[in-house]
Amino acid sequence: MSGTLGKVLGVWTNTVSKQGFSLLRFRSLGENPIFSAGGILWTSRHYKTKPTHGIGRYRHLVKVQEPKKKKAKVELRAINVGTDYEYGVLNIHLTAYDMSLAESYAQYVHRLCNRLSIKVEESYAMPTKTMEVMRLPDQGNKMVLDSVLTTHERVVQISGLSATFAEIFLEVLQSNLPEGVRLSVREHTEEDFKGRFKARPELEELLAKLN
């Protein structure tokens, strides 16, 4: 019995000494005993203070938003008068009571100009105009409000239209003009540029007082 116990203890001591030797060899070579073949399980952690450090980070996935740039103030540019064979800057005015109708036809005119190689300077909306329709009742002399008409206007500004092609271009616009939209083409002037902006009489009075 004592001989058998001595053999078991001797085998166990030999195994422990071999494992200790292999551990020392791994440490001297800089290897990790967990990932090395034949090594014993190493229970120590590589991190001790922040086990969840870096988990759940998302800021590197979100794109950095650029600061919004302020819109540049629209300034009056030099008006191109044109030549004997070519028109200067022309404004195509589209007026309608239905805003969606005026907007869709303005987009059609813009695409048509691009397809026909007519330079489009810009396309913009004019201030909405409101008109009240008054009605005189059968009895009484006081006018009564009958309806309110809202007029929407879009402008497509073009340049470089040749005089020979202008007639054909206007015929195409007239043939595709939807019902309820009024079309007018005229040369661009300084008054047209000022008409783009809404009048602010109170602000103008305050600026006049400050100056």
UniProtKB/Swiss-Prot annotation:
The modification N6-succinyllysine is found at residue 198. GO terms for biological process: mitochondrial translation. Keywords: Mitochondrion, Ribonucleoprotein, Ribosomal protein, Transit peptide. It is found in: Mitochondrion. Its main location: mitochondrion. The keyword Transit peptide applies. It comes from the Eukaryota. Residues 1-27 form a transit peptide. One of its GO terms (cellular component) is mitochondrial inner membrane. Component of the mitochondrial ribosome large subunit (39S) which comprises a 16S rRNA and about 50 distinct proteins. Interacts with OXA1L. Belongs to the mitochondrion-specific ribosomal protein mL48 family. This is Large ribosomal subunit protein mL48. It comes from Mus musculus (Mouse). The lineage of its organism: Eukaryota, Metazoa, Chordata, Craniata, Vertebrata. The gene is Mrpl48.
